[in-house]
Regions:
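N-terminal amphipathic/basic-hydrophobic helices that include classical n-h-c signal peptides
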Residues: 1-15
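Active-site nucleotide/adenylate-binding loops and adjacent lid/helix of ATP-dependent enzymes
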Residues: 17-24, 34-36, 45, 95-96, ...
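Conserved N-proximal alpha/beta basic substrate-recognition cap immediately N-terminal to
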Residues: 25-132
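Short glycine-rich anion-binding loops that position phosphate/pyrophosphate groups of nucleotides
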Residues: 80-82, 160-161, 278
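C-terminal active-site "lid" helix and adjoining low-complexity regulatory extension at the edge
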Residues: 253, 257, 266-305
Length: 305
């Protein structure tokens, strides 16, 4: 009987679906929550870093640490990690290669790239009739200054940025002009977005598999205008209006994400600011008790049956 049980146990382990979770920080809250949610749905989570990935072309091997990436049934991209231009290109190449091998990659490399590139996402929002603030992206100092004059007050962001890092709010005055020139000289390119007067908060909406999972207000700390939770913002429960629901679902659909965090600002109307293709689930869990990672894990389970 004992031998039979061992055989059954080994069979169960061998047939359990293996789900890779790409993280940078192994202690990341969302990464750990994804592991628990994957286990909850009877699958095996395998945490790895794309920053440690290796491809041996003659041998036909692709692995990260001790994990054979080609043996996975699916990959959830929680984080690509900081990287150089060559490095990030290689990481996307790996994800594309896994897709070609028939391994489900969530979110898809294409949708992650669209979401990560603020220029591309802003362009796609406008192209598809989604309200988004006026935006100018340019290598030209004169064009940048002209945009600042037009907007009066603007937000300057890195095209590829996260967690509110490197974001500046500038006015059309001497200080703002100097800051804009400084950013242009430093980066060679500026992404300038019209500042939308708002109630001191934005809305983060979580969408999974074309369904609204939950939403929170992200409220800027006193003395700041940046709402990101990683920059000291506070999460509070939010009930969406029908228009905000429509905007969120449309934005996710246009970018092509399976799961995402859509950021909306309340001004004279609702605007989609940007979309996060690798959002944290911590804020909405602490504010509302919503476990976004369970929705993601359930989608993965159903998609690889």
């Amino acid at each position: 009987l004992k031998q039979a049980f061992v055989k059954y146990e080994n069979f169960h382990e061998d047939t359990m679906k293996k789900i890779g979770i790409s993280v940078t920080d192994p202690t990341d809250w969302t990464g750990l929550a994804l592991c628990n949610s994957i286990k909850h749905f009877g699958m095996e989570p395998l945490v790895f870093s794309l920053g440690e990935a290796t491809s041996k072309i003659p041998a036909g091997k692709l692995y990260s640490g001790k994990i054979d990436l080609m043996a996975l049934d699916a990959v959830i991209v929680r984080d690509l990690g900081p990287s150089t231009r060559n490095d990030v290109s290689f990481r996307f190449d790996i994800l594309c290669q896994l897709e070609e091998l028939g391994i489900a990659v969530i979110n898809s490399p294409e949708s992650i790239a669209r979401a990560a590139n603020k220029y591309v996402s802003s362009y796609m929002f406008r192209k598809n009739g989604i309200a988004t603030p006026g935006t100018v992206v340019t290598n030209c100092v004169d064009e940048a200054l002209e945009a600042l004059v037009s907007f009066g007050r603007a937000v300057v962001k890195p095209v590829f940025g996260y967690k509110g890092i490197g974001v500046e709010c500038v006015r059309n005055d001497e200080k703002g002009i100097l800051k804009l020139k400084e950013l242009m000289e430093k980066n060679g390119l500026v992404y300038i977005q019209e500042f939308i007067p708002n109630p001191g908060r934005d809305i983060r909406v979580f969408v999974v598999n074309n369904e609204l999972v939950g939403s929170i207000y992200r409220i800027a700390p006193e003395g700041s205008w940046i709402n990101n939770l990683s920059q000291g913002g506070t999460a509070k429960p939010c009930i969406l209006t029908p228009e905000q629901e429509k905007l969120s679902l449309r934005a996710s659909d246009v970018i092509g994400t399976t799961y995402s965090g859509v950021d909306i600002i309340e001004g004279d109307r609702d605007y989609v600011m940007e979309i996060n293709g690798t959002p944290s689930g911590k804020g909405i869990f602490e504010a509302c008790g919503v476990e976004v990672t369970k929705n993601i894990a359930e989608y993965v389970r159903d998609s690889i049956k």
